[in-house]
């Protein structure tokens, strides 16, 4: 899934039509390649040593 890019479009306007002015829709592009790489790395760590992975994120001393 590396190299894929997701696109999210948000509509504008009030949805009633008529003579009311229309607003341009906002557009956001999200590059998910970095996220996919990070998730692949986490999966690899979990496969090799899940207990150590969990320990590294557990806070010590109730902090």
Swiss-Prot record:
It comes from the Bacteria. Disulfide bonds: none annotated. InterPro entries: Ubiquitin-like_Pup (IPR008515). Keywords: Isopeptide bond, Ubl conjugation pathway. GO terms for biological process: modification-dependent protein catabolic process; proteasomal protein catabolic process; protein pupylation. There is a cross-link at residue 63 (Isoglutamyl lysine isopeptide (Glu-Lys) (interchain with K-? in acceptor proteins)). Residues 19-57 are annotated as: ARC ATPase binding. Residues 1-35 are annotated as: Disordered. GO terms for molecular function: proteasome binding; protein tag activity. The keyword DNA-binding does not apply. Pathway: Protein degradation; proteasomal Pup-dependent pathway. The N-terminal unstructured half of Pup provides a signal required to initiate unfolding and degradation by the proteasome but is not needed for pupylation, while the C-terminal helical half of Pup interacts with ARC to target proteins to the proteasome. Strongly interacts with the proteasome-associated ATPase ARC through a hydrophobic interface; the interacting region of Pup lies in its C-terminal half. There is one Pup binding site per ARC hexamer ring. Protein modifier that is covalently attached to lysine residues of substrate proteins, thereby targeting them for proteasomal degradation. The tagging system is termed pupylation. Belongs to the prokaryotic ubiquitin-like protein family. This is Prokaryotic ubiquitin-like protein Pup. It comes from Corynebacterium aurimucosum (strain ATCC 700975 / DSM 44827 / CIP 107346 / CN-1).
